[in-house]
Amino acid sequence: ALTVDLSAGNDKGVVSFKKISDGEVKPEPTVVQTLYFDFGSSSATSPGKGDPTVNPDDNGNYWNNITNNNGNYANAGTVYGSLFNSENTPTAYALTLNSRFTINGASGGGGLLQPDKDLLDDLAVATATGDYFFMEKSEDNSSFTFSNLDKNKGYKFYAFGSRLATQV
C-alpha cells in the first residue's frame, strides 16, 4: 500500500510502502505543477538494469531521476534536491530516502519494458517503467520523505509500479 502523510504543522510528506494510515482528508487541490520521478538504475553503476530517463522525454516532459548510488542500492539518508517540475522549472522540494532501496529492471528482470500510452498516458516512458526500486525479503518497511512542502497547500501523489513475476 502507498500512504502519503502530510501532517498539519509539518513541511514534509512521508511516502510509506508498508501500511495505510487514516488521516485528515484535504480538499481536492488545483494542480499547478506536475513532477515526474523515475526510480531506478543509473546505467553507469548498474549496466543492464535500466537507464535514467533522458530529458525531455518523447512527450516533452522532464523527469527527476532517483537512482542508485552504491552498487545495486540507493542508500538511506540520500537526499535528492534540486527537483524540477515537468516543464523543467526548479522547485524547492527535496526527496530523502528514509531507508535503503534496491534497484532492478530491464535485463535484470521485472520492469514494464513496453508501456502502453493508451493505458498510462504520460507515464508510458520505457526508461521510467522498465526499472524500479524495491524492498528485499529481509526488509519490512521502506519509505522516503518529500520536504519543503507548504502545509497550506494540497498535494496529489500518483504512483505506478509493476513487476513481471510469478511470485510476490
Label the model's feature ranges:
Residues 149-157:
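Extended extracellular/luminal ectodomain segments enriched in beta-structured repeat modules
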Residues 10, 152, 163-165:
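Short proline/glycine-enriched turn/loop motifs at strand-loop junctions of beta-rich domains
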Residues 144-146, 161-168:
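Short, surface-exposed beta-strand/strand-loop-strand elements in extracellular ectodomains
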Residues 3-137:
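Low-complexity, Gly/Ser/Thr/Pro- and Asn/Asp-enriched, turn/coil-prone segments
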Residues 1-2, 153:
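Short tyrosine-centred short linear motifs in exposed loops/low-complexity segments
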Residues 41-43, 150, 163:
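Short, flexible loop/turn elements at secondary-structure junctions
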